[in-house]
């Protein structure tokens, strides 16, 4: 595999709530290479979207702050860039597709106006005619029929799938090296979801861009991703090649997520597997492993000692004191 395009090392983020700095991300590390798709998975509140916002430099101010670690993108530490330089990176070399295509677009601007705005900001040498031509070509590239007509309409005239295609067009307008996708298929039905995933795979094959794909849907992970980082309560608990992760999960949380997937060959009226308990609140994080209060393998050591990441193979690491108990 080629050298990483993006390397996140020991990332720490805090949010200030009622005067207290609560750690939302704690030592998150991963890397993404050109042409690779890395999945960030975990249940709601585990820090996936915060990780993306930290990379983009879009943490809510003044409450959200990066307090540790580095974010290296193509040889530059994004955390050290002045705001004007980060502005040139964001939307140009790194783009992001946000959640909820139904609400992410501006309802009082036409599709074309919003897409042309991307070119106005990041391609200042383009004139109005060139911006319009580029926008229409981009709409056609992402599979929107009659792009000239759709250019002039408002988002409410489009279906959810078409709005998501517009979001993808806006994100890819400047041909970014890295595309961050924050649950881009959550609000779509399974047929449209499959179309969007196929579109993204095709565009990636064409451009060679890297993709950081955030989701809680392990089916999407299996379809799209090359490697996976499993997050829980602000920490990366397991990272592996997608086939290795599905075949040989080593962290109890990963094992629980996979076990909760409904099976087509299950028995009638069979109860679904669940992970007992719930994610601890930010102000109640345990001193040791954050999954300890829900883990069937937890010991006293887990409640007091943070597990270090152990490399089980070149592309498989796990942060668990008892991972050997999950070895088949």
Give the location of each predicted region.
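Short catalytic/signature loops enriched in Gly
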Residues: 4, 21, 148-149, 239-328
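Conserved ABC ATPase "signature" region
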Residues: 74-77, 129-149, 258-259
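ABC ATPase NBD coupling module
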Residues: 67, 77-95, 121, 128, ...
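A short, proline-enriched helix->beta-strand linker immediately N-terminal to the Walker B motif
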Residues: 173-177
